[in-house]
Amino acid sequence: MEDAQIIELFFARSEDAISDLDKKYGKLCHKLADNILASAQDAEECVNDAYLSTWHAIPPQRPESLPAFVGTLVRRCSITRYRANTAMKRNSHYDMCMEELETFLASPQQAMEEHYAARELAAAIERFLDTQSKENRVLFMRRYWYADSFAEIGKLLGITEGNARLRLTRMRKQLKTYLTEQEVLV
């Protein structure tokens, strides 16, 4: 079923909308939540919460990209749950992904508190990614949006785990230089 048809089911308030959404994007949503939370039960709850949020948001919203819309809801819910679960604990898979970027970026909480700065930073990162090859953009997004492991990224792109790690290290250095030149980082 096409995304436009699923969106029309939401507008018609058909109960099939959520089941069709789950059939098409359930695997993606669960993978995203699992990568952040590392708990199948919490991931399932976040995916269900995201589906409910989608039900309430459509209508009136009509997302241009249904997987991006639902993925963002899943990711936000998962990060909120993750923060609640690990308020005093550290060293999870998601922490390691974020710590790779935190060496030169503000912490995610600081960035959220400074909404304008976060938007400016996001726009600068998007511009940086526009200068990269498609494979490097996929590499970056799989690591820092989907929180995939180096092994998973390597398998997806047909490269070794070590190559994925090395390329991301180089990209982080390039990103830091780019953000400094753009005066996003001081």
Regions found by a protein language model. Give the residues of each.
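Acidic, proline/glycine-rich intrinsically disordered inter-domain spacer in sigma factors
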Residues: 99-130
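Residue-level preference for hydrophobic side chains embedded in well-ordered alpha helices
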Residues: 21, 25, 29, 50, ...
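Sigma70-family region 2
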Residues: 11-12, 38, 48-66, 84-85
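Arg/Lys-rich amphipathic alpha helix in sigma70-family domain 2
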Residues: 72-94, 118
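Short helix-capping/turn signature of helix-turn-helix
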Residues: 24-26, 36, 131, 141-148
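Short amphipathic alpha-helical interface segments enriched in basic and hydrophobic/aromatic residues
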Residues: 23, 30-34, 51-59, 75-83, ...
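Short, charged helix-capping/linker segments at alpha-helix termini
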Residues: 11-20, 30-49, 161, 184-186
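DNA-recognition helix of helix-turn-helix
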Residues: 65, 79, 125-126, 136, ...
